[in-house]
Amino acid sequence: MQKGVDDISFRACWIAALTDPEKLGTLSRERAANPRLQKCIYWLATVKQRGGDPAKIIDDANEQNKVSGKPYGEFVKAQLLRNLKIAEELGLINPEGLAELRKGNCATITLGPYKGEEATADHIIPRAACPELDNQIFNLELLPATLNSSKSDKIGDRQLDFAKKLNSVGLLSAKGLEAVLAKGKR
């Protein structure tokens, strides 16, 4: 048996709890999913450090949440893996960064032009444009704090395309899509 496999499999339970669509649907505080994203990055990074496959852990978590093979599960998986890559590129995967991420806090960037800034969780489609996506893990990404604040609630081509994709698979309502499209036309 591979060293740490049981420990690694245990992490799938954490990812499942943090990405459970039913639990996320009950969050009422604005931006309540942001710390959940940061905690997921912690668990996935520690899986990778122990020789595990983060994609497999997400698959296991999706299976536990009964979203395996469904659009929700696929979007969560893609976004978590993307955020893990971003965390690695920003130099967040170190003892200090992992300690912050484990608590659901912002970690300090240690690599690249934003070195010294905090990496914050931000909405791909801003909550001001579409509140129904506020607490969805698949709508969150890590960004340097200055980029996050300068982005504001702008809707560009990326957000429009993402909204259309989400709507086409039933993860964004027609009303939500209309709101994003209207914001994007300004």
Ranges and model annotations:
Residues 107-142:
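Histidine-centered nuclease catalytic patch
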Residues 127, 149-150:
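Activation segment
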Residues 145:
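Cys/His/Pro-rich metal-binding microdomains
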